[in-house]
UniProtKB/Swiss-Prot annotation:
CDD domains: IHF_B. SUPFAM superfamilies: IHF-like DNA-binding proteins. Belongs to the bacterial histone-like protein family. This protein is one of the two subunits of integration host factor, a specific DNA-binding protein that functions in genetic recombination as well as in transcriptional and translational control. One of its GO terms (cellular component) is chromosome. SMART domains: BHL. GO terms for biological process: DNA recombination; regulation of DNA-templated transcription; regulation of translation. PROSITE patterns: HISTONE_LIKE. It holds the Pfam family Bac_DNA_binding. It comes from Vibrio vulnificus (strain YJ016). This is Integration host factor subunit beta. Heterodimer of an alpha and a beta chain. InterPro entries: Hist_DNA-bd, Histone-like_DNA-bd_CS, IHF-like_DNA-bd_dom_sf, IHF_beta. GO terms for molecular function: DNA binding; structural constituent of chromatin.
Length: 93
């Protein structure tokens, strides 16, 4: 689901709100989440999961076009860990 699809779905379900209000709310939530992670803080949404930063160690990678080895610096990347309720809801089997 894309951000646009999420907004459309919420508009269909929340008819008492304008599409602009819903779009602004979704954008604000995502912006707050991004700025929270940017500052190094963790986000926890009970029953859904948590977002945090994980450090990737420096490593030797490969340029897919040329095959040349490339030194990649260490960096922090966003990480999502689903909560128990979400894992149980999507468990197939």
């Amino acid at each position: 689901m894309t951000k646009s699809e999420l907004i459309e779905r919420l508009c269909a379900e929340q008819t008492h709100l304008s599409a602009k209000e819903i779009e602004d709310a979704v954008k604000d939530i995502l912006e707050h989440m991004a700025s929270t992670l940017e500052s190094g803080d963790r986000i926890e949404i009970r029953g859904f999961g948590s977002f945090s930063l994980h450090y990737r160690e420096p490593r030797v990678g490969r340029n897919p076009k040329t095959g040349d080895k490339v030194e990649l610096e260490g960096k922090y990347v966003p990480h999502f860990k689903p909560g128990k309720e979400l894992r149980e809801r999507v468990h197939i089997g």
